[in-house]
Amino acid sequence: MRLLLVRHGETDRNREGRVLGQGNQTLTEKGRKQAAAVAGALTEEGITTIYSSPLKRAVETAEMISDKLGLPVQVVDDLAEVDAGALDGMTSKDMRARYPDFMALWDRDPGSAVMPGGESLAHAQQRAWRSAQSFLDEHPDGTVVAVSHNFTIGTLVCKALELPLASFRHVRIDLGSVSIVELREGRNRVVLLNDRCHLVD
């Protein structure tokens, strides 16, 4: 299966440099343009199914792809961004001031750090991988697109490559980008990472 991983377009919190976990922000005008550009870039990929995180910013992006490809959007809860809990809406400076112990653990061992009032990155990775495996079971030879989020996509890529979870810090997933993972029984390959060629900044 070819799994095309699309990160949603820009929101106000992305622009402001604030944590956007499962907060339900909508796309900015720039974000809508990014989503439209992604949709245009995917027309020749032979996609048969569109999946999306349930969060508004992802669904909006997926709906633009849906309009372009003429395929319905199937919402999958496991594709949601990591639940950032009390950190949602904070800047990095805010987090370090209010949650110094958590941030120290996050810097040292992000896989074991549970976001205050939220979930761990390890749990988010587990559910993202579970969704990918369900897509593989249903479309073993197909091409599907999943619209999701920064941590969800980054940790899924690490899992596909059998990298430690902390390696997500070395995987950049920009807004409106496309990454492609080939999933086969016993063999996974990342064939495209963070492609932004379709975007005009």
Give the positions of each predicted feature.
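Phosphate-coordination/substrate-recognition cap region in phosphate-metabolizing enzymes
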Residues: 36-103
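Active-site signature of alpha/beta-hydrolase-fold catalytic machinery across serine-
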Residues: 64, 155, 159
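Short basic (Lys/Arg) and small-residue
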Residues: 149
